[in-house]
Amino acid sequence: PELQFDTCASGGRRLDYITLSYAWPLCQSDCMCYRDHDREATQTENFCLHDWVPLHAGFTWLEPPDDYEFYSSSGNGISVKIWSFEGQHLPEDEETYNWDLAREQLNNQRKIRDIQLNGNIQPLTKHPEERENWCAHACVELSGNRGYILAFRRPGCATAEMTFKLDGVDATAAYELQGLEGFSEVVSGKTLASGFQVVIPQDRGVQLIFFKRR
């Protein structure tokens, strides 16, 4: 009774519905086991697993504290692999490491988790397996009170902005938006529902926007 255990997933091969009724993957695949892992592949994993695996997590090396790297591994949770691997100690210089950014990233991940547990995840882009495409999804709480948009512009992607339509927001309400790099705006629910533009100026870029009803 009340036994809890993690399934390491064996490269993702144990993410079957029977096993997942008893456990959840703190590390959803072996893709992230290496410091130079394929971030775009991890984004695609998360994008697709949201439809099938209610609780799942990737993990991040937090080296350097890079928003693109961190949020690429963001599922319902995230595991932090920051100490040591194959004899390498991380972070290599604890005095100069940006701990404040790491704390901000982990706090944002908690917000993502809480919204997902009370909301519906919405794919915003198609064919994330094709590297020239953005990879983006949103989640809106069932109450319509808050949600987030998480969007990646991949390396070599020529498109700097995309327009997304969100389901589940209140078209009659106003929403406060807060994002990375100091992004802040107030928009109507009608704008979020009919088409909200997200801009990511640089390729290999990410934007995470939280919104809440005023």
Please tell me what each predicted stretch does.
Residues 186-190:
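Solvent-exposed serine/threonine-rich low-complexity stretches and specific carbohydrate-binding patches
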